[in-house]
Structures are given as C-alpha cells and as structure tokens.
C-alpha cells in the first residue's frame, strides 16, 4: 500500500474515532447510525468522591440526530447494578459531527473494578451503547506493584550476498509506518519518542542483533538493488529516522531509562537447536549476538530474549556459559507445569531456575493475557483514553492480588504499532501516560529488579514450549521438516570441511555464518503458507556448505576436528557479517 493510501486510511479511521461498531445503514424512519465512546476524568478513583463521565456521540448520518437521551449505569463484575448516573435528556447531535455530553455524580464504592455502560436512546429504542472500566482502588497499606515491560524488536537481514537491500522494512518500520501531524514515523522511532515524552517510564527492549546490524549498514553504506517498488524505497527521511532512533536508544540506555537485552543473532528457535544436539550453534549465536549488542549499543547485556519464547531445560547451562543471567518465558505455556519449591507460588515475581551441573538462570514469566491484550486489543481502539482505561483496569486486578509483586508484560514491540497506524501509536502513548500517572504502579527494567530484589522462589523444571504452546509452527509438518533435513545435511558436511581446512579459515567461518542464518526461525514460520521466496532462501543457505568448492592449494589440511564449533561465529567481525543474508520475518505486517 502506498503512503498516500495509508494516509487516507488513517484519516478515515481517525474521523470515525469511536469504540462501537455502527448499526446497519439507516433509511427513512430507521434507527440512526451513530458511534459512541465513554471516558472518565480519572483512570483510578478512591473509595468515595465525585465521578465525572464523558459520553462522546458521533452522528454518521447526513441529518441532525434529535430527541436523544443517554442513560448511564454502573455494574459490578457480576453484572449487578450498583449505581445509576443522571440522564442526559432530549439532546441533539449535528449531521456528521461529534458531541460530548458530561455526566457527574457522587459515589461511594468498595475496592473493585466496575463498568460504566452508557446507552443512547431515541423514542425509547436503544440506538447505540458503549462502556468503560471504572477502577476503584484502595492503596492504603499496599506496596506498589512493579511493572516490567519488555518489548521485542526484530527484523531479519534483508541483504543479498552483494550487500544490497532487497526489502525495505528495516527502513520503513523505523521512519515510515504512519503519518502524524504531518510527519512520518516508524514503530521503532515511536518507542523512543514515547519514552522521551514519559521520562519516568522504564522499559526493557530486545533490539535483535540482526536489526542493529541493518541499522548500522543503512547508515554506513546503504545499497538498494531495485527489487522492491520504488515508492517503498527508503527515503532520506527514513535514514535520518534510523540515525535519530539509534541515538535515542543509546541515550535512553545510558540514562538508565531502558535496558537493552540481547538475543541469538539470527533468531533461531533455540530449543530446537538443543534438541537436535546442536548446542554449540546456540552458544555461538548467543555469543555473537551479545558481542554485537554490547559493542554497537554501548551496553553490557546480561539478559536475553529467547526467540519465540522457545525453551527447553537444556538451554540453562548454555545461557549461563554465554554470560546470560535472566530471560522471559510465558505464564500459560511455561509456568503452568513448572516444578520445584516455587511452582505453587505467585507468578508475579522472578524465579531462579536450576539446570544441570549447578547451572541456573533467573526467569520472569510474562502475564500471558495482559500481554496479548496489549498487543492485539488495546492497540486498535480509536479513543486512546479508552485503551488506557482498559489497560489500567487489568493491571489494577493484579495489584489487588499481588501488591509488591512484579508484573511482567512481554511482546513484540513493532507489530502492535503496525496494525492500525497512528491509532495504535496513540493508544500506546496514552497507556504510557496512564502508567506514569499512577503512584501505586512503578516501572522497572529486568536488570534493576534482578540487582535490587532477592530471588527466593526456585524452580527445578520448566516444560518445553513456546509462546504458541509447542514447536509445530517451526518443525513437524513435511515442508518445514524438509528444511531442517537440508540444514542437518549441510551441517554434517560443514563439520568435515572444518576438520579439513581449519576452524580459523575465513571461508569456513563464513559457511558457519550461513548455516546459522539457515537455523533462523523465520524460514519455517512462513513455509508452506507464505511466498515461495522464503523456502527458496532457506534452501539456498541450508545448502551453502553442500555446494561449496574450496579452491585448490589454498587451505592447510587439518585432519583433527575441533571438539566444538561455538568459536566459529565469535569475533567474525563486520567483514564477514556484511556478506550475510536472512529472511523476511514472516510475522511482520507489510505496509
């Protein structure tokens, strides 16, 4: 979709700006078509006070809506009526316009979440309805809830072997996803701007090493081979946005407002590598990713984002060996089924997970439901204050049950901002603002929690799994299995080539790098339902060693295979990395 088309779509959506789907188009004498939203003057209320409600009504008809009455009521979680607000009677809304109606009343309610429901009535017939949470909270004697937000930013490498970009999405998603107030922004840049607007908010980010590399490559030597439409080609604006975005994340990290995690460089599904007996490959990718993250961003990353949250217990000693101290897994698919002394305790805390041979890491389990709502529901509500109210209501429930606890929310960071353009961006900005306004809610990075909070809950086992449950999205079905079989064949050949020519040979290092690319999770995700290009790329890099022909009389023969191959990727440096290519991340929405 061109930028002009995207602008038109955004304008239409913003003009509609409501939370209720319209009724069927009206004819003469039928119910009017309206949209409604309800907001409150505060996100959280004390036990007694004054409640102020604003009901926004948008008339989508070409004639004035007259004789409108608005009834507003309050219900508890069991759908019991607990309060009736004053009616707004016999009002009108102009054609194709929006009017706000204010209602206020004194209240006295217990500590709980309620819902305000506003119904629009014409001649005794309901023609529209909307609702919003009403959070009544007693904070006396309760320790604040710590909120740890973790966002994963990932793009695969879109470079071909000549170092040319074949896809524009690194540049577009940094500087060209949506237009706001006459300026184009991308998801990655918007996160920086939100944090600059809310300096009290602390967030943890995984900036995938393959994304960092492409930011760097774009700034140093951008090359475009013409393989995608010229209208999507990165403009000078997008490259400027990359420069500002990189500087922004570096500055935020230096100030302590954000923490930057690392990840295995090419986003492999780590558990599969371990189960296939390729633990040294995982170690190599973690070390390569950490080295690049640390050097490019000026940090010392001690936490790791586990790609796709794909986990198996065999990863614990590997992560510890690579210098990783903590990671994030899923409540529904990992904490449920965990074993150990802490298995029956609250999920709202960090856990020590003990592996083999004395190894251990710290695990934060994300709240699955709230994380999913944040990225799939509260990013597509035309009224940002409603989105923020919904978020605060969900977090307030956790605060009531676990004051002083740690609520971990973890999700993709760019995808939620791509679903509805500027609507998504404004929703999340409102949520950040709502968080900043709550004294009972404090934000923290994972590293700060680890360094300041004793970890007392211990686990001895976490079940295999990913955010989706198992690993079937990446392995199992024949088209996916065939790719893994090609990788397995190529790896066996590469082991023999390494034994013959030596682990330090630059060509051998390059081949291992290509193999690590083939191990990335993006290939299988899009096979077979996606474009054939994904499978083509997978086999191209899975067959790199198979098709390799070494020049004669160049390499020294080494008949003794090294004991492991984790050192092949470590310290490869920019020269070799410049030659690599990866897949389009299948889950990234294309503009």
Language model features with spans:
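Short acidic/proline- and small/hydrophobic-mixed sequence motifs that coincide with surface turns
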Residues: 63-68, 82
